[in-house]
Amino acid sequence: MARNVEEPAYTVVDTYALFEVRLYEETIQARVRTDGQHYSNATGGFRRIAGYIFGGNQRNQRIAMTAPVHMWAEDGAHWMAFTMPSSLSMEQLPAPNDEGVSLVPNLAGHLAVLAFSGRSHPEKVAKKSQRLLDAVKAEGMEVAGEVVLAVYN
């Protein structure tokens, strides 16, 4: 992880053998629907959002890169998101030039997190996702929402 790269703020609420529960603060994300059936095919989505933060917006404004890059599948589509710097409000963010890039509030909430390292190939992501879901259910918790892959460089 590079130094001086902002990450979403959170508090660890509880720690279990295989995962921890974190309470994340509200953020704003730049999101795009990506092509392909797997996270590994998301290069086009990455380029589109990177284009937005590197000045592809109505003010030609550069926006600081944050970590991680979020990827998930929902309703038969794959999505990618970059979290916007916490110093910028929705009103301060310039509109994207690319109509496929949307600025979306990401509400505060609790997330179960299973950290792992290495490449995020589809088989590994599927295995880790299932392991997380099984561990959460084994602790008697209800799963709500989709599994989100958070990729750090």
Where is each model-derived feature located?
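A solvent-exposed interaction/effector surface
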Residues: 1-153
